[in-house]
Amino acid sequence: MSDYTRANFGGLSEGEAQFSMTARALLDELTDLEGKLRAKLDRWDGDAQAAYWNYQKEWDAAAKDMQNVVAQLGVAIREAHDNYQAAERANTSIWAG
């Protein structure tokens, strides 16, 4: 049995697009949620408001980290796609003479 690698270029392109769309959708959803919360939070005061904003900073940082990971996965998929295509071109050129 021989080992070989098979790449689905269309699938890789689709995967990259899905990760990019997911990263944007995540940011849009969080921005929308924060906008809805701000209207209600403006009525809070004192320790409750301060506690919320402290946690909000942590959530924002975690959401940004998550968005960065999703975006990096999209980049990794694109790089894999490009590398597989380059390898296929190189292998094809061997037979082209």
Curated annotation (Swiss-Prot):
Q: What is its main location?
A: secreted
Task: Output the Gene Ontology cellular-component terms.
Answer: extracellular region
What function does the entry list? May help regulate assembly and function of the type VII secretion system (T7SS). EsxA disassembles pre-formed EccC-EsxB multimers, possibly by making EccC-EsxA-EsxB trimers instead of EccC-EsxB-EsxB-EccC tetramers.
Q: What protein family does this chain belong to?
A: Belongs to the WXG100 family. ESAT-6 subfamily.
State the protein's name. Answer: ESAT-6-like protein EsxA
Q: Could you tell me which Gene3D superfamilies the record lists for this protein?
A: ESAT-6-like (1.10.287.1060)
The compartments listed are: Secreted
Keywords, comma-separated and alphabetical:
Secreted
Q: Does the record carry Calcium as a key word?
A: no
Q: How does it assemble?
A: Forms a tight 1:1 complex with EsxB. Forms a complex with EccC and EsxB, probably wholly mediated by EsxB.
Species whose genome carries this gene:
Thermomonospora curvata (strain ATCC 19995 / DSM 43183 / JCM 3096 / KCTC 9072 / NBRC 15933 / NCIMB 10081 / Henssen B9)
Any matching Pfam family = WXG100
